[in-house]
Amino acid sequence: MLPLPLSILLLLTQSQSFLGEEMDVYSEKTLTDPCTLVVCAPPADSLRGHDGRDGKEGPQGEKGDPGPPGMPGPAGREGPSGRQGSMGPPGTPGPKGEPGPEGGVGAPGMPGSPGPAGLKGERGTPGPGGAIGPQGPSGAMGPPGLKGDRGDPGEKGARGETSVLEVDTLRQRMRNLEGEVQRLQNIVTQYRKAVLFPDGQAVGEKIFKTAGAVKSYSDAEQLCREAKGQLASPRSSAENEAVTQLVRAKNKHAYLSMNDISKEGKFTYPTGGSLDYSNWAPGEPNNRAKDEGPENCLEIYSDGNWNDIECREERLVICEF
């Protein structure tokens, strides 16, 4: 509410049109309210008065309601970096990632400790023959031979001096002949060793030899026949072991001469005779080939066991002489 002096001033300064040309005049008797304002109409053609002085500043009003938020101001300059905070607790493990690319070859590792001793290996191939040693002394005289047929009478000779001289001469000749025979035997023995080395084995009077060729059964049989021999036909464990050593040396399974081409299930020698020795692997012969063909021929493994196979298969050729 405006103070009283200011209200009077405003009323006095209002235009005549605003206040109206007529105003009611009240007597003092009717002004019973001390706050009643009495306004007098200005005389006609009167001059406008000066503006009154500003009134005193009124008391401070109550705080109004908050206005709406203003528009955001421009972004300020970036402040200095703060100090690094202390390390937070570890987070929970993330999901398993995809496998990375394959790494390169690493540096060689440290040598490991020696392993345990391995199993005993198979018997190696025979070593080369040694140099021929010096001739040994003559052996003891053998038993006398059978008596020969009586010869034709010779011409009568001159009278000898003594019979003792003739006997000594004959004894010396016999000793010389025995030494020559021993020398020839040593030469034959060394020659036999040279022939067998490195691809041959001898058992008794048999010799088993291979040239390393690999052929079908019929071609292998033909090759041995042309060499005046036949495919290996072991008839004892010693002969079977000799053939096995050649198989190990070449690291290839080999053909044996026996087959059951004439009668299924009955293996015989090339001469037609029945086997007097065999060394079949467990479950053999089974006559079951991979392509369902007949297994009429025989091979020997590196362990000495036998197995029946198809005759068209190619195996190592070992001939017997």
From Swiss-Prot:
- Looking at the record, the residues that make up the Collagen-like domain are 49-162
Where does the UniProt annotation locate this protein?
Secreted
Point out the signal peptide segment.
1-20
GO MF, one term, reads: D-mannose binding
Free-text tissue specificity from the UniProt record: Liver specific.
InterPro entries per record? C-type_lectin-like, C-type_lectin-like/link_sf, C-type_lectin_CS, Ca-dependent_lectin, Collagen, CTDL_fold, Surfac_D-trimer
Which branch of life, at top level? Eukaryota
Q: Which stretches make up the C-type lectin domain?
A: 222-321
Primary location: secreted
Region of interest (Disordered), residue spans: 43-163
Bias class Basic and acidic residues marks the residues at 47-65, 147-159
Task: Show the disulfide pairing.
Answer: 224-319, 297-311
Q: Name one Pfam family in it.
A: Lectin_C
Q: What processing steps or modifications follow its translation?
A: Hydroxylated.
UniProt entry keywords in alphabetical sequence: Calcium, Collagen, Disulfide bond, Hydroxylation, Lectin, Mannose-binding, Repeat, Secreted, Signal
- Subunit comment: Oligomeric complex of 4 set of homotrimers.
The family annotation for this protein states: Belongs to the SFTPD family.
What the protein does comes down to:
Lectin that binds to various sugars: mannose = ManNAc > fucose > GlcNAc > glucose = maltose > galactose > lactose > GalNAc. Could play a role in immune defense.
What is this protein's record name? Collectin-43
